[in-house]
Amino acid sequence: TLQLSRGLSAEEALEAYIVNELSKARDKAGNSADKSFDETNAGRIMATTGARGSSLNIGQMAGALGQQSIRGRRILKGYSNRALPHFKENDANPDGKGFVKSNYREGLSTLEFFFHAMGGREGLVDTAVRTQQSGYMQRRLINALEHLKLEYDGTVRDPHGHIIQFLYGEDGIDVAKSDHGEAFRIARLIESESIIDSGKKATKEEITDLVKKYVKTFNPRLSKTVLEALLESKLSKEGVDKVCKKALELYDNAKVEPGQAVGVVTAQSIGEPGTQMTLRTFHFAGIRERNVTLGLPRLIELVDARKKPVTPTMDIYLEENHKKSKEKAIKVAREILHTKISALISSTETDYSTKIKLNLNQDKLRERACTIEDVVDALQSSKKKFEIEPSGNSITLTLPEESDTQTVLAMRNKILSTTVKGVTDVERVTIVQQGEEWVIQTSGSNIAKVWEIDGIDKKNIRTNNIFEIAGTLGIEAARNSLINELSSTLEDQGLEVDVRYIMLVSDLMCSRGYLQQIGRHGIAGTKTSVLARAAFEITVPTIAEAALAGEVEELKGVTENVIVGANIPIGTGTVDLYMRVVQDG
């Protein structure tokens, strides 16, 4: 028997199960093909060394191509309950829904080739749409960040001296000069020193004193790493001293130089990977209960600071005495799930003048842990004027006066959307086991209301709605959440973007104490410079309004200086040269 997943209908659960099984079949075929090759096989060498391709490609060449998908789902039955006239109506065979058993070496059958072309077409359209979307996102990012530069005091500021970051990337390291984000690899320095070091092992006190002397300029995280690594090493006092000196030298060399256009570098470092991201909304691997926006659409959603994400979700962790029990987790989940009257009835009846009858479904009431009394209470507190008569499994509502059909139907719809229990906006809940504890995952987000529910760990609720975090926990929490969301969105796509870039974008978006988007309604549209605003979008109205208000152009940023042909005050343009001319006589 099929195990039903919470939050999915029987059809959706079956579909999820079939897709999972077909995916396993493809992997199995690929693995058996992979195992049949020896180490000298050219394709195997390419995949193993990481030169090109992966075991998936080998599986498709020698095993089976697997399921072809369109918009993250199997090929739909668009032609009178079948994908093509070659299949029977409502045929459950995987072949009829785009599963390709052949591989590239043997070649595809006619029908398989057709389904494969359908999947391939989506890839081409996806690429065409993606380039323009990511291109526009990069343009917005560059416009918002271009005027940021590093000052001589190590801060990142805009042309008017407003501080965006007190220390670039929280450690002042230039990503281009670093070793995968680190100024130096302490393990490597210790290793190279230990080869020639021959003195007596330094004591713990000696190492601590030496490190304290050198690491005042390091950031706390780096100081801790250096100290821990040196304490574990077997170096002498002289060796420790040499390592500290070398580390300090490398750290100084890896710092960002004053005047550097950190803003433009950041915009390009986030914009460029955008072209490599996927556009579609996929399901979580394994968990098919909730849709989550991933890839480029999610990245655009974050930098645009959309008030509501397309797919808001929450991960709710439970208190100590609840998290190990599945029954208690289900009980809490039922309290969270938004339950309307429409979810509890089997049918409604009306005479279209004064009476509306609600026939309640006992199974649905049991599933949502509700009673008829709960429904009556919800109706009484809804402030609608009608008489309520519960009898058996039904509730009859009588309006105070006769009304026309439209009024009665409108009233019925309002009654059906009345909340009985739960948190508004949370439309679906799923409980998932993570290690030994149970976690509640939701579709829909509402932190403020979830906090009021008993049994949840109030310090451990996660949501992907940044605006909600800013409204409930403040701008600092929103800034940290924005960094985490941007990082995980890029990492999920297998893209390596340094966290310093993500931090700068997040800090700029939150620098005014509230969330600002990158585009014309946010940072780009609130720039002080008239020419910079006009050069981006809505040119004529911007100039007309500025003229009306009598604004003055100070020519302190990048765009405005390019327009008038003056020196850009970034990089070498930051410095003014003065020369004393000594006149004879």
Task: State the predicted function of each range.
Residues T1-A42, T48, S54, I58-E112, ...:
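Extended, well-ordered alpha-helical scaffold/bundle regions in very large, multi-domain proteins
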Residues D91-D95, G119-E122, V310-T313:
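Gly-rich Lys/Arg/Thr-decorated short loops/hinges at beta-loop-alpha junctions or inter-strand turns
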Residues A10-Y17, G43-M46, G50, V129, ...:
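Non-transmembrane, amphipathic alpha-helical segments
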Residues L22, S134-G135:
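General helical secondary-structure elements
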Residues T110, F114, G123-T131, M137-Q138, ...:
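Intrinsically disordered, low-complexity regulatory segments
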